[in-house]
Regions:
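C-terminal subregion of chymotrypsin/trypsin-like serine protease catalytic domains
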Residues: 8-11, 48, 202-289
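Short aromatic-glycine-enriched beta-strand elements
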Residues: 44-46, 185, 224
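Serine endopeptidase catalytic core focused on the charge-relay Asp
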Residues: 10-16, 20, 28-29, 38, ...
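N-terminal positively charged helical leader segments and presequences
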Residues: 55-58
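A conserved glycine-rich beta-strand in the N-terminal activation segment of trypsin-fold
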Residues: 25-46
Length: 289
């Protein structure tokens, strides 16, 4: 379940670079991953999950036009030969100028977006993904528990084998509570541009404490959410000048607290469950190309 025949972690095969373009010009690059909604009435829909700002170049609720008009991402052709991939390129608007992504109706400020993937895009590919079951584990997580992001910092990764980078930090807030009333966990980590959209996991290889208290032994991969951004603080720096009268001229400097924002997995589960598949097919899919 966790590795393929070549010993590659399942998680390494669910991620993809997500590149925003305007025409053929690259605007920016982030990370995305594949999530499957297991629902007999919805035919196990595959979603590309990433950040809103990765798809548009803007923050949620910024009321700005997207900086690009199409994206590209990748599927592995053969997990036993991960260097072979299929490139997929899609517009982010239909011919009638409707966006192809969905967002959370409950938290429109959440920097999360999902795109249902057409079945034609997965032909000739081996699609690896995570499901809601990955959010369910008896592993106890708490502040200081390890958390791992998987993605493409500054677009850096193993391009020969088309495999991502794993970066590990620790949980910095109480994970069972919503930080500032939003479905967020803060993490202590050194993360960089390009990691936006990375899936976040709590991982155990061996002994771990269960939520009931006892320690057990096993292998756990628990999906916690999606990395979005770092927490910044802004402070004023003044240059003292003596002219005819005292004055202050200054600049503002932004500093990172080395705290990252993780939008919780439940947010993704709920927003994908709430999609009206028939309406999406009629309004988006049939008018995409």
């Amino acid at each position: 379940m966790q590795t393929n025949a070549q010993g590659i972690e399942h998680i390494s095969l669910i991620t993809t670079p997500v590149i925003l373009l305007k025409g053929d010009k690259v605007i920016s690059q982030g990370t995305g991953f594949f999530y499957v909604l297991e629902d007999s009435t919805k035919k196990n829909i595959i979603f590309l999950i990433t950040n809103y700002h990765v798809l548009t170049g803007n923050a949620p609720k910024a009321n700005k036009l997207p900086k690009g008009d199409n994206i590209k991402f990748y599927f592995h052709k053969d997990p036993n030969n991960p260097g072979e991939v299929n490139e997929i390129r899609i517009p982010i608007f239909t011919k009638e100028n409707k966006e192809v992504w969905i967002v959370s109706k409950d938290y429109p400020e959440a920097d999360v977006a999902a795109i249902p993937i057409l079945s034609s895009f997965t032909k000739g590919a081996s699609v690896y993904a995570i499901t809601e079951n990955w959010t369910k584990s008896n592993m106890k997580i708490r502040p200081t528990s390890a958390i791992t992001l998987v993605g493409y910092p500054y677009g850096f990764f193993d391009k020969k084998n088309w495999l991502p980078i794993w970066k590990t930090g620790t949980i910095a807030t109480e994970p069972l509570y919503n930080f500032e009333g939003k479905p967020l966990i803060l993490i202590d980590i050194s993360a960089f541009p390009g990691m936006s959209g990375s899936p976040a996991f709590a991982i155990a290889n061996g002994a771990y404490q269960t939520i009931d208290g006892p320690t057990t032994v096993g292998q756990v991969r628990m999906f916690l959410g999606i990395y979005a951004s770092m927490q910044m603080v802004t402070e004023a720096k003044y240059l003292e000048e003596l002219v005819q009268k005292e004055s202050k001229k200054g600049i503002k400097i932004s500093s990172s607290l080395e705290l990252g924002h993780i939008w919780k997995a439940d947010l993704i589960v709920n927003m994908t469950k709430n999609i009206d598949v028939k309406k999406y097919e009629e309004e988006i899919v049939k008018k995409l190309f």
